[in-house]
Amino acid sequence: GLANVFSPEIVIKVHESHINAGCDMITTNTFGTARHCLEPSNLGDQTIKINIDTVKLARQAVKNSGKKIKIAGSMSTYLALAENEFRPDTKFVPSFAKEEKNYKEQAKVLKEEGVEVLILEMLLDIDHAKILLNAALETGLPVWVGLSCCISKFDETVVGRNFRAEKERSIIYDPLKYPDEPKFLPEDKIINFAEIINSLKSIGGDVYGIMHSWFIDTREGMKVLKSNWNGPIMFYPEIHKFDTSTMQALITENEIEFVDKCSELIDDQVKIIGG
C-alpha cells in the first residue's frame, strides 16, 4: 500500500502493463490499505485519502491506455507485519470490532470512487474473512470472494492456506535469522477448506475462486470448491516464492508453463482468470 504514496508512477506502470497484456479488468492496489494496515507507518489518518488516490491511479492507467477497462476494488484480511518478520505485528492487530469498522470504511470509499466490483483477496480463515465479506456486501456492489488454500502436509486434506501446513515453502529464509515462524494471521489456525467455503457462501458473494495458491494446491482446491459452489469461479495461481537472502521473488513458472497449467483448469464454470 505504501507504493501508492511514495511511488505512484510505478503503480500506474504496473496497471498499464496488465492492460497492455490484454486484461479486461485491473485491480486497485488496495490489498493492504485498510486503516489498521496503514497505522504502523503513521498513515492511519490518511486512510481515506490514500484509498481515494489509489483508485485514481488505476483510473489514470485506464485513461492512458485509451481502452475500456473495468476497475475492481481490492480488499483483504492482510495485517501489518512485524518489522523484519513474516507474521502480523501483535501491536497493530485490531479487535474484531475495529477490524469491521475499518473494512466498512474502506469498502465505502472504494464504492464512492467508482469501482465496479469488490474483490476479496486471499481469504484463508473464517473469523476474519466473514467480517470482510459482510463489509463488502453492505456496499451492494458485486463481490468476488478469493480464497487461498493448500494441501496439508499433515493429513493430505485441502485447508485454508497456512505456512505451517503447506508442503511447498513459500518463503525461503534462515530460521536462525527469522526465529518466529511465518504466519498469515495471528491465530494461525489450520481450517478445512470446505468449511471455509460453506461458512462464507452462507453469507453471500457473487463469484468464488482460488488465488495465491500453488498450481498443485489450486487443482485440488478447485475440486473442493466445485463440490460446494455452483456459481461462477475465478482463479489466479501463485507463481513466485520470496527469497529473504536476496530479497527477491523467484518465479516458478514461465509464461508458456503458466498458460498451459491455467488451460488445464478452465471449464464452463471457470469464468475469470487472473495473473
Task: List where the protein language model places each region.
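Domain-level signal for soluble alpha/beta catalytic cores
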Residues: G1-G275
